[in-house]
Each structure stands twice: as C-alpha cells, then as structure tokens.
Amino acid sequence: MFLKNPSILILDEATSGLDPIVRDEVINLFNEFTRDENHSILISSHIISDLEKICDYIAFLHQGELLLCEEKDLLLSRYGLLQCSQEQLLQLNPAAIKAKRISAYGAEALVLRDQIPPTLTVNPVSLEELFIFLIKERA
C-alpha cells in the first residue's frame, strides 16, 4: 500500500543493486524529500557511502547490538584515527582508545579526539572506517 503524501519513508537497502548513475539520482530524490522539515527517512543499508550522503543521524547495529546512535557530524568529529608507535599507544588513556590495529610498523587506533594529547596528530575518520574498526575490535 502506498500513501499519497507520506511524511516518513522506511527503506531497506533502497539503493542496493542500482548502477551508480541511478543510485545518485535516487539519493538526490531522498535529499529533495527531506528538505521539507516535516519529512524523514529511516533507512537501513550496507552502502555506507550512501548513508554519508543521506543521513543526519546514524544508528549502527551489529549482531543485534546498538553500537552507535548519534548525529553523523558529531560522530565524525568525536572520533579520529591515530597512527603512532606501540609505545605511544600504551601511554594513552585506555578509555580514549575504542579500537586498535597493531602491526610490525606501529599502531593505528580509533580514538576519541578530545582525549588525545595535542602533540599527536589525529586524522579524520570516515563512517566506513569507524564501523570496520568497531566490528573488528569485537571479533
């Protein structure tokens, strides 16, 4: 059943399987729809680049657990990627480190930006990197 003038769209994998041109057109339609403050879209998708273009808020579920639920821009400003030595990583407050990868060449960590000393450079994180770090940390 379709409503004539819906105020909310509930979509599951709405852009999955579409070629890039059509996907871009569909995303533009979604953005036009949400320009009206009374319109919202609840979307589930594995295509994270689409979520970055469409969503204002992100809820990230993994194996039935809600890992994140926050405004997208806040998430991206709150978290960052730190590349450093293993020794530098050990000197950080453990609460600042949300996930990490250790290799023979050093460490890369998903961190809370505001808890990292200004002497260390924290790089921006994408939603995809954020999700991958969080999932792999739980594996």
Residue ranges, per PLM feature:
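Catalytic Walker B motif of ABC-type/P-loop ATPase nucleotide-binding domains
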Residues: L9-E13
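Helix N-cap at the start of a conserved alpha-helix in ABC-type nucleotide-binding domains
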Residues: P20-V22
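ABC ATPase "signature
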Residues: C69-E70
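Conserved H-loop
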Residues: N38-I47
